[in-house]
Regions:
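Conserved phosphate/anionic-ligand binding catalytic regions in large, soluble enzymes, centered on
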Residues: 275-289
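Conserved catalytic cores of very large enzyme subunits
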Residues: 1-275, 292, 296-348
């Protein structure tokens, strides 16, 4: 994932200054009388064209040149105005955000020339004080985001206020398309989110746990412990598979700054511990699990309490594993796209 502000915080202004110089030179060479106001007006038109072309290039590159085995990379674009200082820089970020939303509303053409919704890059739009109320400075941008969601099912939304309460005053995007990192501070005691990574995920099938218990609550918790032990073993297999990996296997990732700046021949081991990277326990089927055990959904009275108890138990288990291993275990709501069918087939045989 990448924040637009992190990438574009100076680029738009650099382009603006370049175009001002070029337009002025062109007017002088052509012998055209001009004012600085006219120069800036023409330069601003070129800035907007460059933003449009740049956003379009990123969109099409992600779904063409960057694909592997016919699948686009799970990339998220994070649209967070407060990521940059107030003033010209934030206004420029708003211009880029506006263009991203407009192009997503339009969609991309498939091989038949039909405008379709691209799966990636995924978009996340942050709701903050200067864009959530009618009349606020960037309210029109939020209206555009809502139109985009109505047509293309993106962007997703993050409340800056709520996330800062939950994440020690930080607001940041997910990795890839869904998994959020835990809060981590570098050697200078500054929060770091970009450039970190996840060691892998193993998903717990809560429906399987419930069905295996035969609606016996005591048996449910016993089976849950057994399944969690199995998940931990699988997660540690993923961890040990990475341990000892030399940075030379992927220099762009480990040596040139995409994820770290390690020396040649150095292993990635120090990045696997202490919270720099995470490893995730996924869960799936909380609603169905609750409905089987309690006869109601996890959002209904009698079901909510049980569902929360399960979630707290999973969270506490991850904390316990983290203390035991010095590896940052996190809890993750698995999307379960292709695995849904696999899990459903497994449940037939219970």
């Amino acid at each position: 994932s990448r924040g637009l502000g992190d990438v574009y915080k100076r680029q738009v202004q650099i382009s603006r200054e370049k175009f001002i110089r070029k337009v002025r030179e062109e007017f002088e060479k052509a012998g055209i009388d001009y004012t600085e106001e006219k120069v800036r007006e023409v330069a601003e038109m070129r800035v907007r064209d460059e933003i449009k072309n740049g956003v379009q290039m990123i969109q099409y590159q992600v779904i063409t040149l960057m694909t592997t085995n016919g699948q686009a990379p799970f990339v998220t674009v994070f649209m967070y105005l407060d990521e940059v200082p107030e003033g010209r820089t934030r206004d420029d970020l708003a211009l880029v955000t506006e263009e991203v939303l407009k192009q997503r509303i339009q969609g991309v053409k498939n091989e038949k020339g039909v405008w379709i919704t691209p799966a990636f890059p995924k978009l996340i739009y942050v709701l903050e004080e200067d864009n959530i109320r009618e009349g606020s400075k960037y309210w029109e941008l939020t209206k555009l985001a809502a139109q985009c969601t109505a047509k293309r099912m993106v962007p997703d939304y993050i409340s800056e206020k709520i996330m800062k309460k939950l994440k020690d005053g930080n607001c940041y995007p997910c990795m890839g398309c869904r998994s959020f990192l835990t809060v981590y501070k570098d050697e200078n005691d500054k929060p770091k989110f970009y450039g970190r990574f996840n060691q892998g995920v193993v998903t717990l099938n809560l429906v399987d746990v419930a069905c295996s218990s035969g609606k016996d609550v005591d048996k449910f918790w016993k089976i849950l412990d057994e399944r969690l032990d199995l998940c931990k073993r699988a997660l540690m297999c993923r961890h040990y598979r990475l341990k000892g990996t030399p940075s030379d296997v992927a220099p762009i990732l480990w040596q040139n700054g995409a994820l770290a700046r390690l020396k040649k021949g150095e292993t990635i081991d120090k990045l696997l511990y202490g919270g720099y990277s995470t490893i995730s326990l996924g869960y799936a089927g909380l609603c169905e699990c609750t409905r089987y055990m309690k006869g109601v959904s996890h959002t209904q009275p009698g079901g909510t309490e049980f569902a929360l108890e399960v979630m707290h138990y999973l969270t506490d288990t991850c904390k316990k594993w983290a203390e035991e291993t010095n590896i940052d275990f996190s809890l993750y709501g698995t999307p379960l796209e292709s695995t849904t069918y696999k899990f459903a087939l497994s449940l037939i045989h219970i």
